[in-house]
Amino acid sequence: LALSEGYFSRRTWGDWLFALLVVAGAVFAFQRYHGAMDVYDKGILVAAVPTAIWLAWLWRPLRTLMLVVAALSLLAIVSYDGDLRRGDTVFWLKYFLSSQSAILWMSVLFFMSTIFYWIGMFARGPAAALEGLGSKLAWVAVTLALVGTMVRWYEGYQIGADIGHIPVSNLYEVFVLFSWITALFYLYYEAQYKTRAMGAFVMLVVSAAVGFLLWYTLVRDAQEIQPLIPALKSWWMKLHVPANFIGYGSF
């Protein structure tokens, strides 16, 4: 009990405000979409609330990340206004916030991050600060990867209720997942150990994944949202795939 009291007493007003926003967001999502949720979806939503709060309290940069991703995703959803054709006419959707645009920017920024990490690793003097720029670019890339994932989820349901699904069902979607999870784990360890020595090597792995993602997109038109095959229409997939790639990314 004393440990719990000490833990909660260390929370700032910003921590509690973030927790309130997460709870409010979950309540809104439940009220608006509960008709489309089965019991497993509702269970995952309930479990996601304390998990998101705990992670943001554990590592405060995640709080900023979650808020920015939520704000940009909501901006995209409001801008679509239920009509996917607006993705070709609304400037910020067409060039930044539609799922394909956000993921393309993610790809470019991960490549740039890798380049700056490598330059910074071998540079001396002021040029060594380029590793810091690589770190910042990686953060922006992670943000856009998450925005692209959230918006793709929305776009799927706008195409059709039987087509929409959590975007972790094919190689295109899971390589996006792998890229941002790997980068985010690295950024956590970078902050914890206060060194960017491994940045060039980790981001090289991420860039390789992004390279495959782009090749697969060009060869297979993998960016197109397709309905789930029957074998993947399971609540277990919603847990199994992210858990797998959390393991891959942390490894």
Where in the sequence are the language-model features?
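Hydrophobic cores of alpha-helical transmembrane segments in multi-pass integral membrane proteins
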Residues: 2-89, 98-225, 232, 239-251
